[in-house]
Amino acid sequence: MLCRFLRPALIEIVDARLQDPRKIVDTVADNGAAAGIVIGGRPVGPMEVDLRWVGGLMMRNSEIEETGVAAGVLGHPALGVAWLANKLGSHDVALEPGHIVLAGSFTRVVFAQKGDTLHADFGSLGGIAVQFI
Protein backbone atom coordinates (compact mmCIF):
# COMPACT_ATOMS: atom_id res chain seq x y z
CA MET A 1 0.00 0.00 0.00
CA LEU A 2 1.42 3.34 -1.04
CA CYS A 3 -0.38 5.40 1.61
CA ARG A 4 -1.09 4.36 5.20
CA PHE A 5 -2.86 7.59 6.11
CA LEU A 6 -3.49 11.17 5.03
CA ARG A 7 -3.28 14.40 6.93
CA PRO A 8 -5.99 16.46 5.27
CA ALA A 9 -5.24 19.68 7.13
CA LEU A 10 -2.21 21.40 5.71
CA ILE A 11 -1.04 24.93 5.03
CA GLU A 12 1.77 25.36 2.53
CA ILE A 13 3.87 28.45 3.16
CA VAL A 14 4.88 30.03 -0.13
CA ASP A 15 7.74 32.52 -0.35
CA ALA A 16 8.22 33.55 -3.96
CA ARG A 17 11.25 35.71 -4.43
CA LEU A 18 10.48 36.38 -8.09
CA GLN A 19 7.45 38.31 -9.26
CA ASP A 20 5.31 38.13 -12.40
CA PRO A 21 5.83 37.31 -15.16
CA ARG A 22 7.19 33.93 -14.04
CA LYS A 23 8.41 31.24 -16.37
CA ILE A 24 9.03 27.61 -15.45
CA VAL A 25 12.77 28.27 -15.16
CA ASP A 26 11.98 30.99 -12.60
CA THR A 27 9.89 28.54 -10.57
CA VAL A 28 12.67 25.94 -10.61
CA ALA A 29 15.31 28.54 -9.66
CA ASP A 30 13.04 29.68 -6.80
CA ASN A 31 12.65 26.07 -5.51
CA GLY A 32 8.97 26.20 -6.42
CA ALA A 33 8.59 29.10 -3.97
CA ALA A 34 8.32 26.51 -1.18
CA ALA A 35 9.15 27.85 2.28
CA GLY A 36 7.51 25.20 4.47
CA ILE A 37 4.36 23.37 5.49
CA VAL A 38 2.22 23.17 8.61
CA ILE A 39 0.45 19.82 9.04
CA GLY A 40 -2.50 19.05 11.29
CA GLY A 41 -5.86 17.34 11.44
CA ARG A 42 -6.50 13.75 12.39
CA PRO A 43 -4.87 10.94 10.39
CA VAL A 44 -7.37 9.46 7.92
CA GLY A 45 -7.04 6.11 6.16
CA PRO A 46 -7.15 6.45 2.37
CA MET A 47 -10.34 4.37 2.14
CA GLU A 48 -12.18 6.06 5.03
CA VAL A 49 -13.49 8.97 2.99
CA ASP A 50 -14.20 9.81 -0.64
CA LEU A 51 -11.48 12.42 -1.03
CA ARG A 52 -13.15 14.03 -4.03
CA TRP A 53 -15.79 15.45 -1.69
CA VAL A 54 -13.49 16.88 0.97
CA GLY A 55 -14.21 20.59 1.20
CA GLY A 56 -12.09 23.26 2.76
CA LEU A 57 -12.24 26.84 3.94
CA MET A 58 -9.14 29.02 4.08
CA MET A 59 -9.51 31.94 6.44
CA ARG A 60 -7.29 34.91 7.18
CA ASN A 61 -7.95 36.59 10.52
CA SER A 62 -11.32 34.77 10.82
CA GLU A 63 -12.52 35.96 7.39
CA ILE A 64 -13.15 33.36 4.68
CA GLU A 65 -10.75 34.09 1.81
CA GLU A 66 -10.97 30.89 -0.27
CA THR A 67 -13.10 27.76 -0.49
CA GLY A 68 -12.68 24.63 -2.53
CA VAL A 69 -13.30 20.93 -2.95
CA ALA A 70 -10.57 18.32 -3.42
CA ALA A 71 -12.03 17.14 -6.75
CA GLY A 72 -10.51 20.36 -8.10
CA VAL A 73 -7.13 18.58 -7.99
CA LEU A 74 -7.17 16.55 -11.23
CA GLY A 75 -10.62 15.17 -10.36
CA HIS A 76 -9.20 13.32 -7.33
CA PRO A 77 -6.12 14.20 -5.25
CA ALA A 78 -4.77 10.64 -5.47
CA LEU A 79 -4.38 10.91 -9.26
CA GLY A 80 -1.49 13.37 -8.96
CA VAL A 81 0.21 11.21 -6.33
CA ALA A 82 -0.21 8.13 -8.56
CA TRP A 83 1.28 10.05 -11.50
CA LEU A 84 4.26 11.05 -9.33
CA ALA A 85 4.84 7.48 -8.13
CA ASN A 86 4.70 6.16 -11.71
CA LYS A 87 7.00 8.90 -13.03
CA LEU A 88 9.54 8.29 -10.28
CA GLY A 89 9.32 4.53 -10.93
CA SER A 90 10.22 5.08 -14.58
CA HIS A 91 13.50 6.54 -13.27
CA ASP A 92 14.07 3.72 -10.75
CA VAL A 93 13.15 5.99 -7.84
CA ALA A 94 10.37 5.24 -5.36
CA LEU A 95 8.33 7.06 -2.78
CA GLU A 96 9.54 5.75 0.57
CA PRO A 97 7.84 5.34 3.96
CA GLY A 98 7.81 8.67 5.74
CA HIS A 99 7.82 10.79 2.59
CA ILE A 100 5.33 13.63 2.67
CA VAL A 101 3.65 14.24 -0.69
CA LEU A 102 1.46 17.27 -1.30
CA ALA A 103 -1.37 16.23 -3.62
CA GLY A 104 -2.15 19.77 -4.76
CA SER A 105 -4.09 22.74 -3.51
CA PHE A 106 -7.75 23.26 -4.24
CA THR A 107 -7.67 26.92 -3.22
CA ARG A 108 -5.68 29.84 -4.52
CA VAL A 109 -2.86 31.34 -2.48
CA VAL A 110 -3.96 33.46 0.48
CA PHE A 111 -1.35 36.08 1.29
CA ALA A 112 -0.33 36.71 4.90
CA GLN A 113 1.54 39.50 6.59
CA LYS A 114 3.09 39.90 10.02
CA GLY A 115 0.36 39.47 12.64
CA ASP A 116 -2.03 37.52 10.38
CA THR A 117 -3.46 34.15 11.33
CA LEU A 118 -4.37 31.66 8.60
CA HIS A 119 -6.77 28.85 9.41
CA ALA A 120 -7.58 25.95 7.08
CA ASP A 121 -10.78 24.13 8.09
CA PHE A 122 -11.63 20.73 6.61
CA GLY A 123 -14.73 20.06 8.72
CA SER A 124 -14.79 16.65 10.38
CA LEU A 125 -11.29 15.90 9.04
CA GLY A 126 -9.77 18.67 11.13
CA GLY A 127 -8.12 21.99 10.74
CA ILE A 128 -4.85 23.80 11.22
CA ALA A 129 -3.89 27.37 12.00
CA VAL A 130 -0.67 29.32 11.77
CA GLN A 131 0.14 32.80 13.03
CA PHE A 132 2.76 34.90 11.28
CA ILE A 133 4.87 36.79 13.81
Regions found by a protein language model. Name each.
Residues 63-65, 82-84, 92-93, 126-128:
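Glycine-rich loops and low-complexity Gly/Arg-rich segments
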Residues 80-110:
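A conserved acidic, glycine/proline-rich C-terminal tail/linker
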Residues 1-75, 117, 127-133:
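Catalytic-core "active-site belt" of small-molecule-metabolizing enzymes
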